[in-house]
């Protein structure tokens, strides 16, 4: 068994010649005596009709190289930026017919039905590519640098393979990150969060990329150290972000952008906590903030979407004013900046940010404060943070629209901290406390929608209709009353970390 740790970098197929020369130059800079091979690799990937290997996050292939055949199973692992880490097992075979019983029995999870899966294995797709391979000396080991050029084939469809992999084989992981930076800058390479197998499943129509818009509670445990809890939260945020980035790259849409925004927001919240623990995060929080500026258009888009949604509270009334409704719909489309976001995702700065987040998660720097148990620290953090939120929301009898909007970022930040540490507490008590505050946050965001409507009506003679103006005012007053009711009810809830 080997524990695979490799950095995957995607390049544009048109860069193949430049990539080949860049890899040669890198290899020569490491060693004057080149250890180089060129291999033609044919790979067939297998799963059951109901994709049970995929459900276990496993990948099974048989690879042909010259007259040699090798069967490989990759077990569940993780992706940090473009760094892939997962256990891998290999056995030689005599034919292109998979046999799971050739692997040692103790590699499988306890609930893994080896023989049932074996009976139903079928080929799903193939990959054929030329592998250019260099071995680079590094510390007490080496790094395998490979350039793969070829294609994935499934159901008559093809997709180009053009990627560079840097696999650590006992060397210094910092060398991999330094090389990754060089490749990003010279070849406009991007972090590869999807493996060849994952892309093959997509091409074969056996998998789909759907945005994850809602973040869930991070799976932290009371017995973990604070370091384990914070780095796990950061890893979860990065995974959520990168999944949605892959969705954006596959088919640019607003839901993918919203999912990215949620993941980035979570990552930044965790980085700020690490910074308070005196962990050197090397400006990562500020760099994340710069990425967030490319997502600020989502606030206006979501406000317009609230007004035009067919199942929303305002759709029926606004539909009566066809010109206004069409203008709202047009504005909703005009505010979208997906093209600019995709350009940002492909930029050097963005890719180097992902690389540095991956570097932080692999290194996991420690401080004395990070060694404490996470539960008591999380309880104190949530209590102190919430005390500030509570004081702000309880300061007067009635809050204005402007005051609610000003308090929204603080409320959202506090709810996000709850996402990081909520699993440490009783689910029913936790959800009972959070629910009215989440409703309040949604209601405050609705104020933005009504402000947009007010602005558009006010600035246009075409829609200066007295009935519409009065209707708007009624909606704003009704929303404010609902917010006041929710706020006062929420303030009476007992915090779940005190129960």
Could you describe each region identified by the protein language model?
Residues 1-499:
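Function-determining surface determinants
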């Amino acid at each position: 068994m080997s524990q695979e740790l490799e950095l995957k970098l995607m390049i544009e197929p048109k860069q193949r010649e430049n990539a080949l020369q860049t890899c040669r130059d890198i290899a020569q800079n490491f060693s004057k005596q080149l250890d180089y091979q060129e291999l033609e690799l044919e790979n067939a990937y297998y799963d059951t009709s109901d994709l049970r290997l995929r459900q276990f996050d496993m990948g099974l292939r048989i690879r042909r190289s010259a007259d040699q055949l090798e069967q490989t199973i990759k077990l569940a692992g993780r992706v940090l930026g473009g760094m892939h880490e997962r256990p891998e097992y290999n056995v030689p075979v005599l034919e292109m017919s998979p046999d799971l019983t050739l692997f040692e029995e103790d590699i499988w999870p306890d609930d893994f039905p080896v023989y049932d899966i074996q009976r139903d294995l079928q080929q799903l797709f193939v990959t054929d590519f030329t592998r250019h391979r260099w071995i680079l000396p590094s510390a007490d080991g080496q790094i395998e640098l490979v350039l793969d050029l070829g294609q994935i084939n499934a159901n008559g469809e093809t997709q180009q393979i053009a990627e560079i992999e840097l696999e650590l084989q006992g060397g210094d992981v910092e060398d991999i990150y330094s090389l990754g930076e060089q490749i990003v800058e010279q070849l406009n390479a991007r972090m590869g969060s999807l493996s060849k197998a994952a892309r093959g499943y997509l091409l074969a129509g056996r998998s789909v990329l759907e945005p994850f818009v809602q973040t869930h509670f991070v799976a932290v445990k009371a017995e973990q150290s604070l370091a384990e809890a914070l780095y796990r939260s950061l890893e979860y945020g990065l995974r959520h972000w990168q999944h949605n980035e892959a969705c954006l790259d596959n088919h640019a849409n607003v839901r993918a952008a919203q999912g990215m925004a949620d993941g980035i927001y979570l990552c930044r919240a965790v980085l700020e906590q690490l910074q308070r623990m005196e962990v050197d995060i090397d400006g990562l929080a500020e760099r994340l903030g710069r990425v967030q500026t490319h997502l600020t258009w989502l606030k206006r888009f979501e406000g317009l979407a609230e007004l035009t949604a067919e199942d929303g509270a305002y759709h029926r009334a606004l539909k009566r004013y066809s010109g206004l409704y069409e203008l709202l719909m047009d504005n909703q489309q005009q505010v979208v900046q997906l093209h600019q976001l995709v350009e940002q995702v492909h930029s050097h700065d963005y890719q180097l940010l992902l690389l540095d987040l991956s570097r932080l998660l692999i290194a996991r720097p420690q401080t004395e404060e990070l060694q404490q148990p996470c539960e008591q620290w999380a309880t104190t953090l949530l209590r102190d943070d919430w005390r500030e939120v509570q004081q702000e929301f309880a300061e007067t009898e009635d809050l204005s629209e402007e005051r609610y909007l000003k308090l929204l970022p603080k409320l959202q930040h506090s709810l996000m901290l709850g996402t990081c540490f909520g699993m440490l507490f009783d689910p029913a008590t936790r959800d009972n406390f959070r629910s009215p505050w989440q409703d309040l946050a949604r209601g405050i965001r609705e104020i933005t929608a009504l402000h947009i409507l007010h602005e558009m009506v006010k600035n246009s003679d075409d829609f200066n209709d007295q009935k519409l103006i009065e209707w708007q005012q009624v909606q704003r007053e009704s929303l404010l009353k609902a917010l006041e009711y929710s706020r006062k009810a929420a303030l009476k809830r007992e915090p779940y970390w005190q129960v």
